[in-house]
């Protein structure tokens, strides 16, 4: 039995909480009037695991009345299992193939906020799609801040190592040039409250013109 067949078997036997929600992302609503953008370009969030892509993405979606999609959750909905299970059955190469296929589809949608996985920028075709199809925001955080945010998260297969802090540092060295390569805007997340970050992002997005 090949890896894909194994994954299908795992999917059928081990449904995961939240899959239904992930499979049907809906536009977020809020009490404040929707912020205005002079374009319908999708907004793509890139950055390391723990940078705040999902949390900030949801905040932006609420402010802009846009649909929010988390690429990892989209993959989990399609496969029926969590990301660590995909890694376990198909390895990182198999996961990256699935990730690339989902990213190519999602980046063609208009008026969405898409939170990508930390390693989505590794593939050249992914970077090209991100650069050409929307506004890319690199959410930047220090290794220490990333470690603090991810140290208790068991849903991070790449950090299942003897020294997760050192692993984060190595991943940052390899990936940061790629984040900067695709980024239209770079935002330091630090310890700033999410609402403040989102509020500071809105005028930058309103003023931005895609080159």
From Swiss-Prot:
Protein name from the UniProt record: Shikimate kinase
Alphabetized Pfam families for the sequence: SKI
Binding site for ATP: 50-55, 156
Biased composition regions of type Low complexity, renumbered to the chain: 1-13
Places the protein is found: Cytoplasm
Cofactor requirements of the protein: Mg(2+)
Residues reported to bind substrate: 72, 96, 118, 175
GO biological process per UniProt: amino acid biosynthetic process; aromatic amino acid family biosynthetic process; chorismate biosynthetic process
Family listed: Belongs to the shikimate kinase family.
Pathway involvement of the protein, from the record: Metabolic intermediate biosynthesis; chorismate biosynthesis; chorismate from D-erythrose 4-phosphate and phosphoenolpyruvate: step 5/7
GO molecular function, one term: magnesium ion binding
InterPro entries given in the database record: P-loop_NTPase, Shikimate/glucono_kinase, Shikimate_kinase/TSH1, Shikimate_kinase_CS
Cofactor note: Binds 1 Mg(2+) ion per subunit.
UniProt-listed Enzyme Commission number(s): 2.7.1.71
The species this protein was found in: Bordetella pertussis (strain Tohama I / ATCC BAA-589 / NCTC 13251)
Keywords, ordered alphabetically: Amino-acid biosynthesis, Aromatic amino acid biosynthesis, ATP-binding, Cytoplasm, Kinase, Magnesium, Metal-binding, Nucleotide-binding, Transferase
Function of the molecule: Catalyzes the specific phosphorylation of the 3-hydroxyl group of shikimic acid using ATP as a cosubstrate.
Gene this protein is translated from: aroK
GO cellular component labels: cytosol
Subunit annotation: Monomer.
Record's catalysed reaction(s): shikimate + ATP = 3-phosphoshikimate + ADP + H(+)
Source species, domain of life: Bacteria
Chain positions covered by the region annotation Disordered: 1-24
